[in-house]
Design a protein with these regions (language model features):
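C-terminal output helix
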Residues: 106-115
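Active-site residues of response regulator receiver
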Residues: 52, 82
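Receiver (REC) domain active-site loop signature in two-component systems and cognate sites
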Residues: 55
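Charged docking surfaces used in two-component/phosphorelay signaling
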Residues: 15-23
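Short hydrophobic/Thr-rich beta-strand motif most characteristic of the beta2 strand and flanking loop
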Residues: 25-32, 40, 102
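Active-site beta3 strand of CheY-like receiver
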Residues: 45-50
Length: 121
């Protein structure tokens, strides 16, 4: 079982992620913005972060850069779950420290497959 933080300003997206991942045995922690996400990342050990790119307060690129400064986030996979599919934005995300990318709308089996590959240890 992995502990997964999902950071998205959309409660329905966070709920959808939870509905897909919890039955597979994962513990899903939710955050609605960058500040909540950072606080929850600092509060406990995480196996994976799934974040949106476009959020109201601060975008996902800034969140990834902040997470990558935390000693606890070294080597931790971070996946973007976003409507963006632009190659330039994907390269920016990779440079910031993103491990993977899933485009919304997503299929539950796609999310499970990506999570399964990244949290296997």
């Amino acid at each position: 079982m992995a502990t997964i933080l999902t950071v998205d300003d959309s409660p329905s997206i966070r709920q959808m992620i939870k509905v897909v991942l919890e039955p597979a045995g994962h513990n899903v922690i939710e955050a609605g913005d960058r500040a909540q996400g950072l606080a929850k990342a600092q509060a406990g050990k995480l196996d994976l972060v799934i974040t949106d790119l476009n959020m109201h307060v601060m975008n996902g690129l800034e969140l990834i850069r902040a997470l990558r400064k935390l000693p606890s986030a070294v080597g931790m996979p971070i996946v973007f779950l976003t409507t963006e599919s632009n190659d330039t934005v994907k390269q920016e995300a990779k440079s910031a420290g993103a491990t993977g990318w899933i485009t919304k709308p997503f299929k539950p089996e796609q999310l499970l497959a990506v999570v399964g590959k990244l949290v296997r240890a």
